[in-house]
Amino acid sequence: MSAGTIASHVGNASLLLLLAGCLLLTSCSSSGSDGLRAYPKAVGAADEASAIQNLRTIANAQTQAKAMRNSYADFNALVQLGFLDERFAGVNPNLRGYRFTVVANENEYAVNADPETTQTNPTTGGRHFYLDSTDGVVHVSPTQTATRQDPAL
Protein backbone atom coordinates (compact mmCIF):
# COMPACT_ATOMS: atom_id res chain seq x y z
CA MET A 1 0.00 0.00 0.00
CA SER A 2 1.43 3.37 -0.97
CA ALA A 3 1.68 6.41 1.30
CA GLY A 4 -0.97 8.20 -0.77
CA THR A 5 -3.44 5.34 -0.34
CA ILE A 6 -2.84 5.26 3.44
CA ALA A 7 -3.36 9.03 3.70
CA SER A 8 -6.59 8.69 1.72
CA HIS A 9 -7.88 5.95 4.07
CA VAL A 10 -6.94 8.01 7.16
CA GLY A 11 -8.69 11.06 5.70
CA ASN A 12 -11.83 9.02 4.95
CA ALA A 13 -11.81 7.54 8.47
CA SER A 14 -11.51 11.03 9.99
CA LEU A 15 -14.43 12.23 7.89
CA LEU A 16 -16.53 9.24 8.99
CA LEU A 17 -15.69 9.91 12.66
CA LEU A 18 -16.64 13.56 12.25
CA LEU A 19 -19.98 12.62 10.67
CA ALA A 20 -20.68 10.05 13.40
CA GLY A 21 -19.92 12.67 16.06
CA CYS A 22 -22.32 15.14 14.45
CA LEU A 23 -25.06 12.51 14.30
CA LEU A 24 -24.49 11.57 17.94
CA LEU A 25 -24.60 15.21 19.02
CA THR A 26 -27.83 15.77 17.13
CA SER A 27 -29.49 12.70 18.62
CA CYS A 28 -28.35 13.60 22.15
CA SER A 29 -30.01 16.98 21.92
CA SER A 30 -33.36 15.12 22.03
CA SER A 31 -35.15 16.45 19.00
CA GLY A 32 -33.04 19.55 18.62
CA SER A 33 -34.39 22.54 20.51
CA ASP A 34 -36.49 20.46 22.94
CA GLY A 35 -33.31 19.03 24.42
CA LEU A 36 -31.77 22.47 24.68
CA ARG A 37 -34.84 23.81 26.51
CA ALA A 38 -34.69 20.93 28.99
CA TYR A 39 -31.18 21.89 30.13
CA PRO A 40 -32.12 25.12 31.99
CA LYS A 41 -35.03 23.30 33.64
CA ALA A 42 -32.66 20.61 34.87
CA VAL A 43 -30.22 23.22 36.18
CA GLY A 44 -33.10 25.05 37.89
CA ALA A 45 -34.23 21.84 39.55
CA ALA A 46 -30.66 21.22 40.73
CA ASP A 47 -30.41 24.77 42.16
CA GLU A 48 -33.71 24.30 44.01
CA ALA A 49 -32.63 20.90 45.34
CA SER A 50 -29.39 22.47 46.54
CA ALA A 51 -31.31 25.25 48.32
CA ILE A 52 -33.55 22.70 50.05
CA GLN A 53 -30.55 20.64 51.12
CA ASN A 54 -28.85 23.79 52.44
CA LEU A 55 -31.98 24.59 54.48
CA ARG A 56 -31.76 21.14 56.06
CA THR A 57 -28.05 21.61 56.73
CA ILE A 58 -28.83 24.93 58.43
CA ALA A 59 -31.57 23.26 60.51
CA ASN A 60 -29.06 20.62 61.70
CA ALA A 61 -26.55 23.35 62.56
CA GLN A 62 -29.22 25.24 64.51
CA THR A 63 -30.07 22.09 66.48
CA GLN A 64 -26.40 21.68 67.39
CA ALA A 65 -26.09 25.34 68.38
CA LYS A 66 -29.17 25.13 70.61
CA ALA A 67 -27.81 22.01 72.33
CA MET A 68 -24.36 23.53 72.83
CA ARG A 69 -25.18 27.08 73.92
CA ASN A 70 -28.90 26.95 74.69
CA SER A 71 -29.66 29.43 71.91
CA TYR A 72 -30.07 29.45 68.16
CA ALA A 73 -27.58 31.49 66.12
CA ASP A 74 -27.00 33.61 63.03
CA PHE A 75 -24.85 32.44 60.14
CA ASN A 76 -21.59 33.93 61.39
CA ALA A 77 -21.98 32.26 64.79
CA LEU A 78 -22.85 28.92 63.17
CA VAL A 79 -19.70 29.18 61.05
CA GLN A 80 -17.54 30.19 64.04
CA LEU A 81 -18.92 27.27 66.06
CA GLY A 82 -17.94 24.95 63.20
CA PHE A 83 -21.50 23.82 62.43
CA LEU A 84 -21.50 25.40 58.95
CA ASP A 85 -18.64 25.85 56.49
CA GLU A 86 -17.28 29.19 55.26
CA ARG A 87 -19.73 29.36 52.35
CA PHE A 88 -22.36 30.38 54.91
CA ALA A 89 -20.31 33.24 56.41
CA GLY A 90 -21.92 36.67 56.28
CA VAL A 91 -25.32 38.13 57.00
CA ASN A 92 -27.06 36.78 53.87
CA PRO A 93 -24.89 34.22 52.08
CA ASN A 94 -25.66 33.44 48.44
CA LEU A 95 -25.17 29.81 47.46
CA ARG A 96 -25.91 28.58 43.94
CA GLY A 97 -28.09 31.59 43.25
CA TYR A 98 -30.12 31.46 46.47
CA ARG A 99 -29.86 34.16 49.15
CA PHE A 100 -30.25 32.74 52.64
CA THR A 101 -31.56 34.82 55.53
CA VAL A 102 -31.92 33.74 59.14
CA VAL A 103 -33.66 35.26 62.14
CA ALA A 104 -32.62 33.56 65.36
CA ASN A 105 -32.92 34.10 69.08
CA GLU A 106 -32.73 31.98 72.20
CA ASN A 107 -35.97 30.11 71.55
CA GLU A 108 -36.57 29.96 67.80
CA TYR A 109 -35.19 30.48 64.34
CA ALA A 110 -36.55 30.92 60.83
CA VAL A 111 -34.57 30.68 57.61
CA ASN A 112 -35.49 31.66 54.05
CA ALA A 113 -33.93 30.77 50.72
CA ASP A 114 -34.87 33.18 47.94
CA PRO A 115 -33.60 33.16 44.35
CA GLU A 116 -31.15 35.99 43.80
CA THR A 117 -29.01 36.35 40.74
CA THR A 118 -25.53 37.75 41.26
CA GLN A 119 -22.58 37.89 38.91
CA THR A 120 -20.85 35.01 40.68
CA ASN A 121 -24.00 33.02 41.58
CA PRO A 122 -26.58 33.04 38.81
CA THR A 123 -29.75 31.13 39.56
CA THR A 124 -32.17 29.26 37.42
CA GLY A 125 -34.39 28.20 40.32
CA GLY A 126 -37.51 30.29 40.82
CA ARG A 127 -39.28 29.04 43.93
CA HIS A 128 -38.86 30.49 47.43
CA PHE A 129 -38.33 28.28 50.49
CA TYR A 130 -38.83 28.63 54.27
CA LEU A 131 -38.01 26.48 57.28
CA ASP A 132 -38.25 27.20 61.01
CA SER A 133 -37.64 25.62 64.40
CA THR A 134 -41.27 24.67 65.06
CA ASP A 135 -41.43 21.56 62.88
CA GLY A 136 -38.49 21.50 60.43
CA VAL A 137 -40.82 21.36 57.43
CA VAL A 138 -39.77 23.16 54.25
CA HIS A 139 -42.50 25.46 52.92
CA VAL A 140 -42.55 26.77 49.35
CA SER A 141 -43.92 29.78 47.49
CA PRO A 142 -43.72 30.07 43.71
CA THR A 143 -43.74 33.87 43.59
CA GLN A 144 -42.55 35.52 46.82
CA THR A 145 -40.63 34.99 50.04
CA ALA A 146 -42.11 31.89 51.66
CA THR A 147 -43.58 31.75 55.17
CA ARG A 148 -44.89 29.08 57.53
CA GLN A 149 -48.35 29.59 56.00
CA ASP A 150 -47.20 28.48 52.54
CA PRO A 151 -47.70 24.86 51.45
CA ALA A 152 -45.25 22.27 52.73
CA LEU A 153 -42.92 20.77 50.19
Model-derived regions, located:
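Extracellular/periplasmic head regions of type IV pilus-like filament subunits
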Residues: 37-41, 60-125, 133-135, 142, ...
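Bacterial N-terminal signal peptides that target proteins for export
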Residues: 2-17
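C-terminal motif of bacterial Sec signal peptides marking the signal peptidase cleavage site
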Residues: 24-27
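Membrane-proximal amphipathic alpha-helices
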Residues: 44-55
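Bacterial signal peptide processing site
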Residues: 29-31
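Small, basic N-terminal interaction modules of short regulatory proteins
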Residues: 20
